[in-house]
Amino acid sequence: MAPAPPPAASFTSAEVQRRLAAGACWVRRGASLYDLTGFVRHHPGGEQLLLARAGQDISADLDGPPHKHSDNARRWLEQYYVGELRADPQDPTENGAGAPAETQKTDAAIEPQFKVVDWDKDLVDWQKPLLWQVGHLGEKYDEWVHQPVARPIRLFHSDLIEAFSKTVWYSVPIIWVPLVLYLSWSYYRTLTQDNIRLFASFTRDYSLVVPESVFIGLFVLGMLIWTLVEYLIHRFLFHMKPPSNSHYLIMLHFVMHGQHHKAPFDGSRLVFPPVPASVVVAFFYVFLRLILPEAVAGILFAGGLLGYVLYDMTHYYLHFGSPHKGSYLYNMKAHHVKHHFEYQKSGFGISTKLWDYFFHTLIPEEADPKMQ
């Protein structure tokens, strides 16, 4: 017979208030208490919205308006559960109740579904590297990988390989921006020689001279092309559903993108690590060189590479930044968090929604309750 689980911790209102006064952000749902201090700056609605509810019951906020929280958001909340609110016998104002009467009861149909996360009973052993384990999940993999958790991930047994699989955010601009500057300067100088022609490999008579004045246009075109590549890779490669009977394709999916959906706030896995990124960058450079004149290919590539850097920086900020309410990045953050927690089959644009508009994969807007 399995041992009974340990009793939940309990706190009086006075104990909760002391923690709030010390700067913590605790909230409650009925009598259940949650410490969201570490999540405040990640909240898609902004820090202030969450801080304003410190010490309060958030049951109504979970159901909206303005936003009805998804099942995954409610599961996410349970990872921050710390205990129950209990009556303080020395405080006569509580009248023997640990929480106001209207918040004592919770929906019995919902409660079991979003119980406290039990890491010991998960489908994988979180004390061991995950990569080899996920391949054995089979049909359970897709549902499991789209139920995010608030903890870091380890993929490999080897410390060396593990180190190559993650990185800090600032490695991206440090490594790639100097290359963008060098390529831009080098290929601009090549354009100034006035001997670059398009279609010269097919016909000299109808080939087009590429003047230096088109440098900016080619560079911006490269950035625009990157936004399309970003969208296509995210939608069709990262969000492919691997066959449930393919151990290795499941592992490949988890390495490419599944790990990010499982642990969306693992800061060491939010941007593309330099070693695997170098392989992909080299592929795109060689591909462009094969189909275009060297200078044209190089300028397009430099623009695309800068587009990639901006994409990775934007992606990191959407997870860890706290943009001003109403700003472009605020709306993009809300859009991207919905992609993680509720709409995994839409909202594939990270740096822009342009291609979501074009291919009709926008995340549906929630109806304004004031208009109903």
From Swiss-Prot:
Residues recorded as binding Zn(2+) 2, renumbered to this chain, are H260, H315, H319, H336, H340
Top enzyme class of this protein?
Answer: oxidoreductase
Coarsely, its chief localization is: endoplasmic reticulum
**What is the membrane topology here?**
Multi-pass membrane protein
Q: Where do the TM regions start and end?
A: 168-188, 213-233, 268-288, 290-310
Q: Which reaction does it catalyse?
A: a 1,2-saturated fatty acid + 2 Fe(II)-[cytochrome b5] + O2 + 2 H(+) = a (R)-2-hydroxy fatty acid + 2 Fe(III)-[cytochrome b5] + H2O; hexadecanoate + 2 Fe(II)-[cytochrome b5] + O2 + 2 H(+) = (R)-2-hydroxyhexadecanoate + 2 Fe(III)-[cytochrome b5] + H2O; octadecanoate + 2 Fe(II)-[cytochrome b5] + O2 + 2 H(+) = (R)-2-hydroxyoctadecanoate + 2 Fe(III)-[cytochrome b5] + H2O; docosanoate + 2 Fe(II)-[cytochrome b5] + O2 + 2 H(+) = 2-hydroxydocosanoate + 2 Fe(III)-[cytochrome b5] + H2O
Question: Out of the domains of life, which is the source?
Answer: Eukaryota
The coenzyme or cofactor needed here is:
Zn(2+)
Please give the pathway this protein is involved in: Lipid metabolism; fatty acid metabolism; Sphingolipid metabolism; galactosylceramide biosynthesis
What does UniProt say about this protein's domains? The histidine box domains may contain the active site and/or be involved in metal ion binding.
This chain's protein is named: Fatty acid 2-hydroxylase
Q: What is the organism of origin for this protein? A: Rattus norvegicus
